[in-house]
Amino acid sequence: MFGAIAGGIASALAGGAMSKLFGGGQKAASGGIQGDVLATDNNTVGMGDAGIKSAIQGSNVPNPDEAAPSFVSGAMAKAGKGLLEGTLQAGTSAVSDKLLDLVGLGGKSAADKGKDTRDYLAAAFPELNAWERAGADASSAGMVDAGFENQKELTKMQLDNQKEIAEMQNETQKEIAGIQSATSRQNTKDQVYAQNEMLAYQQKESTARVASIMENTNLSKQQQVSEIMRQMLTQAQTAGQYFTNDQIKEMTRKVSAEVDLVHQQTQNQRYGSSHIGATAKDISNVVTDAASGVVDIFHGIDKAVADTWNNFWKDGKADGIGSNLSRK
């Protein structure tokens, strides 16, 4: 830097000196000092101080209180001013060019500038993708794409959850159905067992009552038949079974025939009381079978069999009423 300044000053001094010596390429004035006047090609000036100063300095007369600048100082001032202005201008341009070069914009084509910009952004923002580094639109596109991915994941999660819920509901329904089926079977089994127990108990009670009636010697045959029918009909009504008048008449006839048979066999045997107990069950069976709907209570016969017995009491045409009836 200092070498450049010194060189500039020397060059300016040399140029100024030559210009002063040779008149800047103009011929020297002819003439000289003649007496008390200074003669030139154009005019004649008096030799007084004022005339000389006016002729040399022109109309711009310097302040007499200030020292007149020498030739060397004036030349150096001009050279320094020019050097400073040139240096500042050159420095500013160099700094600008350097800054442009740093960002990749100094004296390059549009393609090179774009490539440099992309490289710069990629190095400055490595966490962004190319679309996001390109600008707001690209960033929006990236956000939209991310939104699509999120929506896909959300939809997949919802479908998976629905599938799991459906499977859980299906398994729960299976378990409930299994529990209900097992409970129903158990309830049916318990009901059947209870019904069988009730039937056995009622059959036993019926037989005991018939035997008690038959053993009562104070009752006439008609009274025995009436008592047997009364207790059997009461038992049937308790079970919700009702008979028509025709059915009751037919049942009474059969019970009467059985009572006659019991009395006859009792008279023919030595131990009649024991025979009464044995045959009381036969009478109970006759009444039970004849009671049609009551057969569900005593024997557990289904509805079809009960209907068959009901039809028997209506038309008197049924097969296999019982072995007891064959003895009437």
Curated annotation (Swiss-Prot):
Q: What superkingdom heads the lineage?
A: Viruses
Family, according to the entry, reads as follows:
Belongs to the microviridae H protein family.
Cross-referenced InterPro entries, in alphabetical order?
Microvir_H
UniProt keyword annotations, A-Z: Capsid protein, Host-virus interaction, Viral genome ejection through host cell envelope, Viral penetration into host cytoplasm, Virion, Virus entry into host cell
Quaternary structure? Interacts with B, G and F pentamers to form 12S pre-assembly complex. Joining of twelve 12S complex form the procapsid.
Q: What is this protein's function per UniProt?
A: Self-assembles within the capsid. Upon host cell recognition, probably forms a tube that serves to deliver DNA genome to the host cytoplasm. This tube protrudes only at the time of infection.
Location in the cell reads: Virion
- An example Gene Ontology cellular component term from the record? viral capsid
GO terms (BP aspect): lipopolysaccharide-mediated virion attachment to host cell; symbiont entry into host cell
Extract the GO molecular function terms from the UniProt entry.
identical protein binding
Pfam families, per the entry:
Microvir_H
Annotated protein name in UniProt: Minor spike protein H
